[in-house]
């Protein structure tokens, strides 16, 4: 309706029409601010003489789509030795500890966070970090040296519920519309959600036969809890951690039980057999559930317009 506003403050349930202006048309209305064009959104107004109450609800589901074509030939390690035992990064070093069940299994470079180590071999059993953790259900159990990383294990199905309630009424020389929308979304990333609330009021009336008054008010509330991050931004960008880094032999589902009885976190990227603290990467499920970051934004948008019909069909 002519008021410049943030796109995040727009409630699509209130939109009646959208028009795109380019070039001189946008510049004529908005000056330099319209130099790149303008999107004109007209919101709904009251239309029913008797009064109309409308209620709508939408349910939307979303899921993570994995389109990464990741190599499945080599496991954790940095140099991919071609002969058994010729590099420290190879898996082919026998476990020398005293944990029952692990004798005859191999260890590898747990500290390394890339997957160019020894080639996979289903005949080989290896010691995982969980095999060394006496508080884990995997304690004393070796795993098969094979590809196990599935990024879909990091995510869930996200669901969005949106409810809109509006009331509109129109009589001679007067129309009004009030609407409220509440939207709650659980994200595909565990322990993430978002809230959107929109309140809108729009009225038009003619106090005299030659004057028209239009008033519009919009309130928007937006809260994000653990919104997804992007780029090289530390351990919170979990997807980046397992596409740029990571070990493809790790089965992430084994690490969903991420917390030990003492409160410390289990991770696949330990420093060594004797040091189970994280070398570079924490447990992704711990990052999802133990960090809670909330951001709240609010917008109040007021706009008003008065037009006066003068004699000789002139307007001001």
Across the structure, where does each feature detected by a protein language model lie?
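A short glycine-leucine-enriched loop at secondary-structure breakpoints
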Residues: 29-33
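Histidine-centered metal-chelating micro-motifs
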Residues: 25-27
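Residues embedded in well-ordered regular secondary structure
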Residues: 1, 47-191, 229-231, 259-276, ...
